[in-house]
Amino acid sequence: MQEPSQTLEAAESVTVVPLTQDRYSEWDQFCLQSPDSWFWHTTHWLEYTLQFRPELQPRSLSFLCIQAGAIVAICPLIVETYQHEGEYVREFSYGGDAGPAPALADFLSDKTRKRVLRRIFAHVDQLADELRVGRASFRMSPLAPSFSNVTAPQMNPMLKWGFNDISLATQVIDLTAEEQQLLRKMRKGHRADITRAAKLMQATIFDKDSITHERFERYRLLHKKAAGRVTRPLATFQMMYDWIRNGLAILSAARLNGSDLGFALISVYRDGAYYSSSCEDPDHKNLPIGHILQWRAMQWLRQFSIRKYEIGMQAHHSQPHMIVSNKESNISFFKRGFGGDAVPLWRAEKFYSRPYCLRILRERAEKFSATMGEAVD
């Protein structure tokens, strides 16, 4: 009998099958096995994104690739509608940002991977033509196993498929180190703030075994208070609560004298974690709340064998494809204080409309040129 990989090599055709809810389970099972996937590829994140910005009229066009009866790849894909200079334009995006790049099966040879990727992007191009999509953008996660399984520096893989580079950088902390080593790699001020915070307040982790609706509701209400408004649909908070209940996230909480000071929600998947969301009581801005939230989360993640923690994007200064505000620069500086290394956040885009391409690139050039002379962080 032939091995599955050999059978797939012999099969020429790759069939595209739209993702429907009855296939959610096998899609998510595939995500657990693909070297290219992380939480962003799952139906959990897909459903969250479909609820995140309803004004964009998001619609899933996600699809699977089947070859010789087996799933060989998945492509999360959402079409969203934007208003730009008085016109409505469709894009393949994820809640206003780049979507997860295709993920392939772990048993494919290099030759078959190329064939499958060619089929995937041909289908994306076909959908773009049918729907008159102006632009498609994808990103790859540094928490996916394939990102780390390389022996030499790599170029953005999506450039091979007709996409243009819009990559950024993100900070990833290696949690396999001992706690004292992690502390030594932090900025001196961060270590001092963690020590001070530990003496002032209580930090707790709510996971699937300890989260309750009442505890999560406290996070949602503080999130509203900190932002001064409700920032997104209630359904997205319910989904986050379900993630914690299902072991896909944890909630780091800080209290002082029985009052909530802050929360941080950390997505957890496979052997990686991502700093997804946080809020702090604006009445206590003088306290190092964020420092203790992150440190307590890192301790929990280490305890449960999470190896990599992506604390978030690094914005040192503006790029043509991303203008950095002072607030974003300060947030990046805060995140770097916890140590770790800056790694590529591979992102890529492809324009399907020449007029839309010209408008976007001219707009970027005007905004970027206005930043010339700004200080570099």
Set out the residue ranges of the language-model regions.
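A conserved beta-strand-loop-helix scaffold within acyl/acetyltransferase catalytic domains
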Residues: 14, 18-85, 142-286
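Short, high-confidence coil segments that cap the C-terminus of an alpha-helix
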Residues: 58-60, 130-133, 249, 306
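Active-site catalytic microenvironments for nucleophilic, acid-base chemistry
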Residues: 127, 225, 300, 304
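Conserved acetyl-CoA binding element of GNAT-fold acetyltransferases
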Residues: 86-108, 271-282, 312
